[in-house]
């Protein structure tokens, strides 16, 4: 049923060459969506590998590269998506996380974080939502950040940008629900980064002062976040709209 409904529908995922983006692309391909993934210039090989992983699902797929701080990238994403079918799902997964003391944050860094985390999410949604409205069905999913809800040191620009995504989610959800498009925000907790030694599960990170209490005594993994995103993209999820869904094992319970 899902694969038939999703035929010729395109899921666009930004910042999706690996980790949560890759896991989500695989699950959406399983549901029959054609897949377009966007990546920055540093992850091209990972993007190619992700596309290779999608081959077994017999769907159309492609990737594009570009810096979301350069807003021309939005047009590149839209044009590439249209070549695969009708843009129907947008997962705004790309994001910058720059650490700096509040009083030392350079305004250029502030603007870059806002451009990538907020402006690009807005502009991608604006560019693609027209096609969702025309078919009276679509999904916009913003990937938020736990820091927007609990705060964080040395990340004022990141915290502010992720909080803005919650507001953007609510605005889109109210404006487009009568036209068949829902918008939700998924907020991962501490997720294992298999590419980085720094975030390997260890006593150090479990005791880190900026790590919330991990009630399950472990980090999450990208597949667990991707499962939530993929379920929101099902036809059966029409009644879930304007929500902020936390995936953190119970470490933060609003």
Predicted feature locations:
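A glycine/serine/threonine-rich, flexible loop-to-helix segment
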Residues: 99, 178, 185, 189-214, ...
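Residue(s) in the substrate-gating loop at a strand-loop-helix junction
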Residues: 145
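Alpha-helical segment proximal to the catalytic Tyr-Lys
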Residues: 130, 174-178, 238
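Active-site helix of classical SDR
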Residues: 125, 161, 169
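Conserved glycine-rich cofactor-binding loop
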Residues: 17-18
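Substrate-binding pocket helix/loop in short-chain dehydrogenase/reductase
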Residues: 101-102, 109-111, 210
